[in-house]
Structure formats: structure tokens, C-alpha cells
């Protein structure tokens, strides 16, 4: 019934979460919205993040009544969408600082109480540092715990190769596609496509 969309509304600094009621597919209706504090400039909010950082929803994936949302330099949120008209924040986690931000792709694995989260590079030749794929234990949605990072491709010097190096998109186990809670497919800009085995979530291996 509902679609969970990244949208830029007037008065906001960037993209936020919009929940659309698709009961009438020809007439989608806005049911609810959620944003990080500081994004609604038109409502008198003031951005709290550092100059040069971008707080913007890339996208959210929903499993059950929980939306796992990636906010670029704003990190990760887990949002309760039980009431579409009143989405409610459960937790906000941000690894920037000390890590570089760019949170891009969430992948919840509900059958294992895990979340894979990829941070995207935004510069060439690793000039802003490396970006990572993170593994979170989310058995307690209000307390996601980072338990591992995925190994970085190391068979070549990809930072020196030119262009961007680091994680980008994850295969999202969409209906009708290949689905796995053990094999993780990740694009890596100039390092191609990588497949990781997470049978042991504490030690992902390529």
C-alpha cells in the first residue's frame, strides 16, 4: 500500500523521507514525512552539521514496520513506520566523524537480525579517506551495534588508479530477484563488483 520515497520538498535543505499512500495508484497521496533535525529550514530549523557536509536521504529499505534509512553524511536512522502518517525515530547512528560519511546503501537481513550498510566515496583517488561496508547487529533495533567491516579490495592500488574507489550499491534482495542473507553483492566503483560471504557475520570474506 505504501511507497517510501526520497524527495526534496520546498523549505527543506535536501531530500527527506516521504511516505506515499498508493491505495489509488493513479493518485498517490502523501501520508507522512520524516527528516533529520535541522533540515526544515522553512520551518525555522537550523542545520547543525559542518559546512561541506550533506545531510540528505539517499533511500530507505523497509522490512516489517522498520525503515532503515541512509542519510549520506547524516548516517543511519531506524524509523518505525507502523503508522504511516506518524513515522517515529527509533535510533540515529552516524560514524562521521571519525569516518568519512557518505552513507548510501542499507540492506536489512531480517532473518539474521543483521544490517549491511555501505558508505559511498565522494572524491577521486581516496582524497577524503576510505569508505567502508559495515555489518551491524540489529537484534535490538534501538541499539544497532557495528560488529565488522567488510574487507577492502587489495589486489591493486585502486586509490592510485584514478576515479572513485569504494562501495556504492548493494544487491537489495528485491522480490522476483536472487535473494540471499549470506551472499552480499556490492559495486565498488573502479574496483568492479564484489561478492562477499557473511556466513560468519563477524568476519565477512570476499
Give the ranges of each region predicted by the language model.
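Feature marking well-ordered beta-strand scaffolds used for ligand recognition
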Residues: 1-206
Amino acid at each position: 500500500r505504501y511507497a517510501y520515497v526520497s524527495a526534496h520538498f520546498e523549505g527543506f535543505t535536501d531530500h527527506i523521507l516521504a511516505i506515499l499512500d498508493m491505495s489509488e495508484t493513479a493518485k498517490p497521496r502523501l501520508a507522512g514525512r520524516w527528516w533529520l533535525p535541522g533540515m526544515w529550514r522553512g520551518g525555522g530549523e537550523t542545520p547543525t552539521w559542518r559546512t561541506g557536509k550533506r545531510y540528505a536521504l539517499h533511500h530507505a529499505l523497509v522490512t516489517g514496520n522498520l525503515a532503515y534509512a541512509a542519510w549520506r553524511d547524516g548516517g543511519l536512522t531506524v524509523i518505525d513506520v507502523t503508522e504511516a502518517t506518524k513515522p517515529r525515530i527509533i535510533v540515529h547512528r552516524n560514524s562521521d566523524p571519525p569516518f568519512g560519511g557518505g552513507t548510501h546503501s542499507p540492506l536489512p537481513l531480517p532473518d539474521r537480525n543483521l544490517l549491511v550498510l555501505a558508505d559511498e566515496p565522494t572524491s577521486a583517488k581516496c582524497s577524503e579517506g576510505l569508505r567502508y561496508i559495515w555489518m551491524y547487529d540489529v537484534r535490538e533495533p534501538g541499539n544497532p551495534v557495528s560488529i565488522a567491516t567488510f574487507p577492502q579490495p587489495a589486489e591493486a592500488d585502486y586509490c592510485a588508479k584514478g576515479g572513485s574507489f569504494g562501495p556504492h550499491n548493494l544487491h537489495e534482495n528485491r522480490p522476483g530477484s536472487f535473494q540471499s542473507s549470506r551472499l552480499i553483492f556490492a559495486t565498488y566503483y573502479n574496483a568492479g563488483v564484489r561478492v562477499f560471504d557473511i556466513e560468519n557475520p563477524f568476519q565477512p570474506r570476499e
